[in-house]
């Protein structure tokens, strides 16, 4: 008579591959537990409804997995649309938006009143987690006028700021309370009583360094940093800060603030900075919790041989 413990074949459960995926994530969960990760939200992920929803899911997943996510956002597409609607001409110089006084009013309105509110709402569909603030709040970001150099000459690009000071107190208080800070890339002015538009890539990198973050993640509309664009679409999966510094002069203008941000972050003590394809749903989870990862990772020089 059988006791039910015969040598019958083990049933092949269809869910077993999911267990393997979870186990693959275990060492990464252990490594990142309790660590701060700053995520710059931008590109197509900001205007595609499915990508926005997936982004919110990823960030909330990080929070429940024991990480401390901080979201920094710009609003390029939304700002351009609003400026067109108000009949304000907008142009870019050195990869940065020229921001007149009139344009600054629109930038502030769109970032703090539209993009941030929508993102906070998406995150809070999963629980009372996200809190929105701008760099003005609690003096989180302070900036002075930024004048880039083009062909050897300083160029006036209006109310575009260069971050001079960061106060992480408000963000750290929110993280300690289990919240997800969502920061709009606007800074208070060190020079006058106005505000500055600051590049969101730059703001995210500066915040990551100031917070002592484990990781900076920058969402883009490309797969990562290409090895020899446009002659090759081979993505560089990993490089050191010094290797990146050598490549900077030859990068396209749109990638310069992103890669300069990554360089600043790792030189400022952030363990890794990653540029990932925001067009891929759940790219954040793929980058952090899988062996292969996705995109380009920048590491400090001393990690180059590891």
UniProtKB/Swiss-Prot annotation:
Domain of life from the UniProt record: Bacteria
A single MF term (Gene Ontology): ATP binding
Entries under Gene3D superfamilies matching the protein: Acetylglutamate kinase-like
Binding site for substrate: 75-76, 97, 197
Keywords: Amino-acid biosynthesis, Arginine biosynthesis, ATP-binding, Cytoplasm, Kinase, Nucleotide-binding, Transferase
Catalytic reactions on record: N-acetyl-L-glutamate + ATP = N-acetyl-L-glutamyl 5-phosphate + ADP
Pfam families recorded: AA_kinase
UniProt pathway: Amino-acid biosynthesis; L-arginine biosynthesis; N(2)-acetyl-L-ornithine from L-glutamate: step 2/4
EC number: 2.7.2.8
Known function: Catalyzes the ATP-dependent phosphorylation of N-acetyl-L-glutamate.
Similarity comment: Belongs to the acetylglutamate kinase family. ArgB subfamily.
Protein name from the UniProt record: Acetylglutamate kinase
Species of origin: Streptomyces coelicolor (strain ATCC BAA-471 / A3(2) / M145)
